[in-house]
C-alpha cells in the first residue's frame, strides 16, 4: 500500500519530464513583461497579484529564475518533488504516529494517491504550487507539535517559523476579506 503513492509521484515526475513544456504559461509572463523577474524589492514581494499576496512564493520564483534561467521544467520538477514529496513524507510520518500499527498507516496512506493526479499543481503555471506550500509548512508544524523529539525552545522556534512561512506564502483575497469582515464586526 505504501508503494502506490510513491509510484504515482514517480509517474507524475516522469510524465512531466517527458511531456512538459519549457514555455512559461500566461501568468508566468507577467514578470517578464514588467521586467522584475529577478527583483527582491519588498514593494514587489508584498504586491497583490490576482488579489493574492505570495511573498515567500515570489522569493522562490526569483531564486528559480536565477538558478534555472526561467526554464519551467527544472523549476516545476523541483517544486513537484519538494511539495508532493514533502506532503507524502509528512502524511506518512503523521499517520504512522497516530495509527501506531504499520498496516493501518499503510492502508490510510494508500488513499493519498488521489492527491497525486496529474495537472493538479504542475504542468500549467510555475506559481500554482504556492497554494500547496502552506499545507506543507502546517503539516510540518503539526508533526513537530505531536511528535516532539526536540528541546522546547528550538521546537517552538521552528513551529513559529513554519507558521510565518505558511502565512506569508499564499494569502488570497478571500482570506483578507474574511479578516477585514471579522475585524469590523468584532
Give short role names for the model-derived ranges.
Residues 1-11:
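Start-transfer (signal-anchor) and selected internal transmembrane alpha helices
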Residues 10-30, 121:
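Helix-to-loop transition at the C-terminal end of transmembrane segments
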Residues 46-69:
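Short hydrophobic/aromatic helix or loop-helix immediately within or flanking a transmembrane segment
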Residues 67-86:
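Loop-to-helix entry region of an early transmembrane alpha helix in multi-pass inner-membrane enzymes
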Residues 80-101, 139-144:
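Transmembrane-helix motifs of polytopic, lipid-linked glycan transferases
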Residues 94-117, 136:
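Transmembrane-helix signature of polytopic, membrane-embedded enzymes
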Residues 133, 138-156:
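Membrane-interface transmembrane helices that cradle and orient dolichyl/undecaprenyl
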Residues 154-169, 174-181:
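Membrane-interface alpha helices of multi-pass inner-membrane proteins
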Amino acid at each position: 500500500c505504501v508503494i502506490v503513492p510513491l509510484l504515482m509521484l514517480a509517474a507524475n515526475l516522469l510524465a512531466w519530464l517527458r511531456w512538459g513544456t519549457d514555455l512559461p504559461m500566461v501568468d508566468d509572463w507577467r514578470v517578464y513583461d514588467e521586467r522584475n523577474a529577478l527583483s527582491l524589492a519588498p514593494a514587489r514581494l508584498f504586491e497583490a497579484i490576482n488579489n493574492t499576496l505570495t511573498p515567500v512564493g515570489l522569493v522562490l520564483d526569483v531564486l528559480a529564475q536565477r538558478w534555472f534561467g526561467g526554464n519551467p521544467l527544472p523549476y516545476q520538477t523541483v517544486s513537484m518533488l519538494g511539495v508532493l514529496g514533502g506532503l507524502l513524507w509528512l502524511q506518512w510520518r503523521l499517520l504512522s504516529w497516530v495509527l501506531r500499527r504499520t498496516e493501518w498507516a499503510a492502508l490510510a496512506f494508500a488513499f493519498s494517491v488521489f492527491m497525486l493526479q496529474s495537472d493538479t499543481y504542475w504542468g500549467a503555471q510555475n506559481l500554482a504550487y504556492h497554494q500547496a506550500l502552506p499545507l506543507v509548512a502546517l503539516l510540518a508544524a503539526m508533526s513537530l507539535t505531536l511528535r516532539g523529539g526536540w528541546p522546547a525552545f528550538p521546537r517552538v522556534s521552528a513551529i513559529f517559523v513554519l507558521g510565518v512561512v505558511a502565512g506569508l506564502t499564499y494569502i488570497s483575497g478571500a482570506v483578507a476579506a474574511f479578516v477585514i469582515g471579522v475585524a469590523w464586526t468584532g
